[in-house]
Swiss-Prot record:
Residues 106-356 form the GS catalytic domain. It comes from Phaseolus vulgaris (Kidney bean). It is an enzyme of class 6 (ligase). There are at least four isozymes of this enzyme in P.vulgaris. This is Glutamine synthetase PR-1.
Length: 356
């Protein structure tokens, strides 16, 4: 190993109780992630033990230069798979010095919804299928694709194996293990229909933790692709033409849905979602109209449709759920670049709190 590698992998706990905390927050675009580190005197297990911090919001598009300070509040802690030991990753949300959430802080409102007693009683579970595309850095073109050209048509790549079908698996597996190490409820990975595109799943996670875990999983993936020299894209339709887009299908259930007779509650919830289709679409990610065309396993963006085992529907119910008379459903509308705080809390709000 090189000296640099040796130093990167130093085990601090051999010589000190001090730990490094990497504070993570969402930047001005609402999708970009930012982070910086600080030294703490000793191990920490609860976010309430961590100090608030600040950053220059004028450099992230979140504050004017003459009043640039943005305050970040620690909200959840994960083990750091990069520094390891007692070092931690800290997901934060952002506020003005007066304590008001800034516009890109979608966690604040989500936390309000998830703390509502009616929502708490239903214990909403989420499983989010995060699709993404790996791009060659210099040409902004999917890995495994000839520069300026195209691979063979879709068909052999979904869950494919082999040097001519799976591109970037080392990144995918590194991310998988890093998420398990961090304490994220990552439940699986698979190659997607378009070559160079992959998916990981986070969940089941309850309430606000689904958003926290997905954002940290995205951060870890961004860090790994940084090391690999590959660009990570959450564009919902990275390549025009006869290629699948990238989504973030969101699986959802409440306690009532999971109990005997829950299928009736599932159908009732789907009817509510249909009545607020436009509002949900508006909040489900930028550029989603390029993906939701009615082709490539999607429903048309202007049409609300649900069905059993129908991957061309807005909402899909699994055959196992129909057979058992209880379970969960899948909202297939969210784009890969959606904010999980927005999507998860909006589904809970519509299905539990909203009265048509």
């Amino acid at each position: 190993m090189s000296l640099l590698s040796d130093l990167i992998n130093l085990n601090l706990s051999d010589t000190t109780e001090k730990v490094i905390a990497e504070y993570i927050w969402i930047g001005g675009s609402g999708l970009d992630l930012r982070s910086k580190a600080r030294t703490l005197p000793g191990p920490v297990k609860n976010p309430s033990e961590l100090p608030k911090w600040n950053y220059d919001g004028s450099s992230t598009g979140q504050a004017p230069g003459q009043d640039s300070e943005v305050i970040i509040y620690p909200q959840a802690i994960f083990k750091d798979p990069f520094r390891r030991g007692n070092n931690i990753l800290v997901i934060c949300d952002a506020y003005t010095p007066a304590g008001e959430p800034i516009p890109t802080n979608k966690r604040h409102n989500a936390a309000k919804i998830f703390s509502n007693p009616d929502v708490v009683a239903e214990e909403p579970w989420y499983g989010i299928e995060q699709e993404y595309t790996l791009l060659q850095k210099e040409v902004n073109w999917p890995v495994g694709w000839p520069v300026g050209g195209f691979p063979g048509p879709q068909g052999p790549y979904y869950c494919g194996v082999g040097a001519d079908k799976a591109f970037g698996r080392d990144i995918v597996d590194a991310h998988y293990k890093a998420c398990v190490y961090a304490g994220i409820n990552i439940s699986g990975i698979n190659g997607e229909v378009m070559p160079g595109q992959w998916e990981f799943q986070v969940g089941p996670a309850v309430g606000i933790s689904a958003g926290d875990e997905l954002w940290v999983a995205r951060y870890i993936l961004e860090r790994i692709t940084e090391v690999a020299g590959v660009v990570l894209s959450f564009d919902p339709k990275p390549i025009k033409g006869d290629w699948n887009g990238a989504g973030a299908h969101t699986n959802y259930s409440t306690k009532t849905m999971r109990n005997d007779g829950g299928y009736e509650e599932i159908k009732s919830a789907i009817q509510k979602l249909g009545k607020r289709h436009k509002e949900h679409i508006a909040a489900y990610g930028e550029g989603n109209e390029r993906r939701l065309t009615g082709r490539h396993e999607t429903a048309d963006i202007n049409t609300f449709l649900w069905g059993v085992a129908n991957r061309g529907a807005s909402i899909r119910v699994g055959r196992d759920t129909e057979k058992a008379g209880k379970g969960y459903f899948e909202d297939r509308r969210p784009a890969s670049n959606m904010d999980p705080y927005v999507v998860t809390s909006m589904i809970a709000d519509t299905t539990i709190l909203w009265k048509p």
